[in-house]
């Protein structure tokens, strides 16, 4: 009898533990009025779902435009919790992730919270902090971030108008894929800012498009900032078009007393423009830092800069390069050359 009771108790406790650890699946639709447990009972409040989501939870967001606040709070952002998977691009009837057809439905995360002028938009649309590789953002259009604050440091009012990935004093390396980042503006890193101050930011950015983003200074699309830390992102199968900045209109990499060793593969850099150097990519080493991009299988076409180099400026590792462009320190390629690696 005691053995039966013991076995029953173990089964009960095991089932209880499984129920406690079970992951939640939330559904978000603009017209939703439910608790978010199914498409039929979807909620319209994405911010509320993000606030209660825990590691292992999954969020599906249907087509439509979502803003981080309905008020005039420019500091509001969509904060993605560590370990949470957030997917957009749904019609609102899919049963499996594979039922989603990318491009069929547009799920937009927008910083347009005020009037039609951008100066009252939210500073940063999406924010990660200490996010592990299990954290996923997939299938969104991210637009309208406007980080025009005074340049006094690497904060959300000046950097990362589209996405701010903060690994300061920790590690933040989420997966960002199948996203379009367009028409974002900031002082630095308009589309994505990876900040590694005394920490690490090594996200994977895959199958994304960066279109018409603009920064006043560094990184029109992406700024990988290895400031006293480690910033080694993987960027693959992405396209960069029409982005603008002072330095590094497509991607700017900086190793300020730290390490910045990005791997950029199978990407296209087309018609990006920098005022000074690096129409496509600029590597900036400061202090005793290390900064070197590994490039493989990329295409550079019609990128330009007023003073310096149109495509890639500074030291890089080139793999599978064409014979007429040998790998060497200080590789400089003019935008008149459409070069494929």
Predicted region positions:
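Positively charged n-region of N-terminal signal peptides that target proteins for export
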Residues: 1-4
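Bacterial N-terminal signal peptides
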Residues: 7-15
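Sec/Tat signal peptide C-region and signal peptidase I cleavage site
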Residues: 16-22
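Right-handed parallel beta-helix
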Residues: 23, 88, 134-146, 171-185, ...
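Acidic Gly/Asp/Thr-rich repetitive segments characteristic of extracellular carbohydrate-active
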Residues: 30-68, 77, 122
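Extracellular beta-strand-rich solenoid/capping regions of secreted or surface-exposed proteins
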Residues: 47, 54, 68-85, 93-138, ...
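Glycine-rich beta-solenoid repeat tracts in large extracellular/virion proteins
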Residues: 77-80, 124-130, 149-151, 161-168, ...
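Acidic, glycine- and Ser/Thr-rich low-complexity intrinsically disordered tracts
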Residues: 85, 94-120, 295-296, 304-341
